[in-house]
């Protein structure tokens, strides 16, 4: 497999292996140079981060495996939540959901604009079969960690769209 820069740490390294790569721990601050010199062949980062950090200057292609799912979490102390009246809780919940939806929409727009920029710059953008990646990687995860997962966890993971 390719030498794929993954963050240091057991779980990140295992993720790289599960994707069929040779994971190479490289500090984020050293990634540009690692790509430039061939220490690594590729990287594992959102495309927007790749543009902001100018990794596209030393990268010719982007493969959108979408193997990490980002999500928003809105949290509030239970003491504060419990002190609210039901109508206040409902308003807070609605505002939180609206904020998360707007954040997701902005992220998706920024990602689409970044991918369009990469294509205009002559970069190749590939979108492989997500199910093939999931099946390949999931087998390794189930073998290594499956016995430690709560009952039904895999089904809930696979239900995410």
For the regions a protein language model found, what residue spans apply to each?
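N-terminal secretory/targeting leader peptides
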Residues: 1-161
